[in-house]
């Protein structure tokens, strides 16, 4: 709770985080941020727009085929332009097993461009947690099926506490 004080209470801000669990870490982070920033919105895979309770807080993008529309990008830009808090997962997908261990994939640098354009501080968040060994093995063999399997992983973690460490704002 004390680390939430790192997040500016007003004005545009971009909150970035790793993505170890999938939608569960996003929902948990959004819930925590909303407690101090009722204007917070989260950039999500457009498939999550089917979750009605998430819709008021979500800014969808098509990160499956990298075909995010201009309208979707404008919605993100408009939110920052009015001084909103924006939560992003720069990897664009859940962490997976790699030779270096369980890590996010390469981060998209769009959050840096947005921060520069809108003079928004960047607040880094390190989210803890892991999915099952089965998930990571499945993602090595059949990545699309492992993405669908994330729903099952989410229910395994439903009563767990998700740890998150919020860093100091990085200004341009």
Model-inferred region functions:
Residues 19-23, 94-95, 130:
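Gly/Ser/Thr-rich loops at beta-strand to alpha-helix junctions
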